[in-house]
């Protein structure tokens, strides 16, 4: 009896639970890509530029020549480009255009002399010619007498100048040598021959003199900087010492 009831229920379910055979739809084929898209929706792709926007370049660096032209603009240093035939000389015209040397107000003459000498030395080491060195000096020496500048620019003609350059890696000795050259340079312009000779003789006879300064004095004396008589004495003594 129970078996008949179960069979009847199954028959009723099969008749009313399934759709008619004429309306049965074919099963949809499985689409893996569609299923993945529904589970993990693709995010919109953003370009890298939106995360790291490109900055605008600084207009002052757009061209290679812009920086250099700001340093070496002819209008900044008109003296260096003036015709050489004008009266007064290159630095003379630079000094003539100043009124009291405002660029160096309060600076001592000694500091300016050192500046001229340092610029001249640097220019020589860089291979600059006299006009370029004058241009270099004119930037820092406005208001300084033309004769002073012209004299200091000739300081590299002193025989011991190259020895002085060799001391550039010894600051203490370099400073002493610089003071000596500046003193000699000044004496050459103002002192008489007898005063120069006395100065050279005094330094040559000085005991416990700095070895580098002593060598510079000897080099200059041997080239006649301190006069012919001292040169003959020094060279004669050198020859005697060499001959034993």
Swiss-Prot record:
Signal peptide range? 1-17
Q: Where expressed (tissue)?
A: Component of the acid-soluble and acid-insoluble organic matrix of prismatic shell layers (at protein level).
What superkingdom heads the lineage? Eukaryota
Q: Which UniProt keywords apply?
A: Secreted, Signal
Compartment(s) of residence: Secreted
Task: List the GO cellular component terms.
Answer: extracellular region
Q: What is this protein called?
A: Uncharacterized protein 1
Q: Which organism is it from?
A: Haliotis asinina
